[in-house]
Curated annotation (Swiss-Prot):
The gene is ispH. The lineage of its organism: Bacteria, Bacillati, Bacillota, Bacilli, Bacillales. This is 4-hydroxy-3-methylbut-2-enyl diphosphate reductase. Keywords: 4Fe-4S, Iron, Iron-sulfur, Isoprene biosynthesis, Metal-binding, Oxidoreductase. Binds 1 [4Fe-4S] cluster per subunit. It is an enzyme of class 1 (oxidoreductase). (2E)-4-hydroxy-3-methylbut-2-enyl diphosphate binds at H43, H81, H131, T170, S226, N228, S271.
Length: 331
């Protein structure tokens, strides 16, 4: 069996930043305890379990406001997906110490929404309903942000203003966003469009579209709640023409998928620990369809290998530089 190791894959800088911020919090004796994360720091249960092992507790729920109601004391970390100003204000009003791990790319989109609101625009935001990033985007300017996920949502819009700005969730499929933006342009010809697929998401999607073409199947390693992981599987099917299977870790890999395969492509979501991908690759490298002794799939739970090992003293400066770069038109 030939294994196509799609590159790039796995952790993006936003995920790494958020994890380092949370790890640093665990090492700071001056922060009020307990330390909670408002939702999953990134959408991967292996990561949240690893943080719980060092005293950083995930509190989850339907939305950020609801989750915050469950936290009464200590420190709260806002996840990489971002939160609305009202959630931040509520946390402060409750007397909680707050730490913001929002990805700079997401912050840039939120800032853009505020700028366009101040300039008198109605904002159409393309995103996945129920995902925390669009929740935060809508909450940034609820009077002018209109969340759409499908063409039916766009059909239902009734906007009288000619000043319309269109942007999107950073982890969407770039092809889906382009399709919906084209549809929006047909209904609102004067709309200004600004695609905000983050570069890490885009290059991972493009890699799958190109590198999975010759594979018999693609294995996408990532949490079932990860939107960017779902989009990678979608890209494999729709753009590379290769069937795809999503697994959280090696224990979910079905032998039936691979026993007759000649080429297997492997990629991973931006919130997937490298250790989990390595286990899949090592298994495939030794797999022999004719030898059942090679079929055993085991996950070695090693939290130390999932969590970042060192503090990054330049973290705040690096994040500020990234935000400035995006504001100046960078990608």
């Amino acid at each position: 069996m030939e294994i196509i190791k799609i590159s790039p894959r796995g952790y993006c800088y936003g995920v790494i930043d958020a994890m380092v911020i949370a790890k640093n919090a665990s090492l700071d004796p001056n922060l009020p305890r307990p330390i909670h994360i408002l939702g999953m720091i990134v959408h991967n249960k292996h990561v949240t379990d690893a943080f719980e092992s060092i005293g950083i507790y995930t509190v989850d729920g339907a939305n950020r406001e609801e989750i915050l109601d469950k936290i009464t004391t200590g420190t709260v970390i806002f996840t990489a997906h971002g939160v609305s100003p009202s959630v931040k204000a509520k946390a402060v009003a409750k007397g909680l110490t707050t730490i913001d791990a929002t990805c700079p790319d997401v912050l840039h989109t939120y800032n853009l929404i505020l700028e366009k609101q101040a300039a008198g625009y109605e904002i159409i935001y393309i995103g996945k309903k129920g995902h925390p990033e669009p929740e935060g985007a809508y909450g940034t300017a609820p009077d002018v942000v209109h969340l759409v996920e499908t063409k039916a949502d766009i059909d239902a819009l009734s906007l009288l203003s000619d000043k319309i700005f269109v942007t999107n969730q950073t982890t969407m499929s770039k092809w889906d966003v382009a399709d919906l933006m084209h549809y929006i342009k047909g209904k609102f010809p004067k709309a200004i469009q600004h695609q905000e697929i983050c570069m890490a998401t885009q290059v991972r999607q493009e890699a799958v579209a190109l590198q999975a073409k010759d594979a018999d199947l693609t294995i996408v390693v990532g949490d079932p709640r990860s939107n960017n992981t779902a989009r990678l599987a979608q890209v494999s099917i729709e753009k590379a023409g290769t069937k795809a299977y999503r697994i959280a870790d090696i224990t979910e890999l079905d032998i039936e998928w691979i026993k007759d395969a000649k080429k297997v492509a492997v990629t991973a979501g931006a919130s997937t620990p490298t250790q989990l991908v390595r286990e899949v690759l090592l298994f495939l490298e030794q797999f022999d369809a004719a030898d059942k002794t090679t079929w055993k799939r085991e996950h070695n739970q090693d939290f130390e290998r999932i969590l970042p090992k060192t503090k990054n003293k330049y973290m705040a400066e690096k994040r500020s530089q990234r935000l400035a770069h995006l504001k100046n038109g960078g990608s």
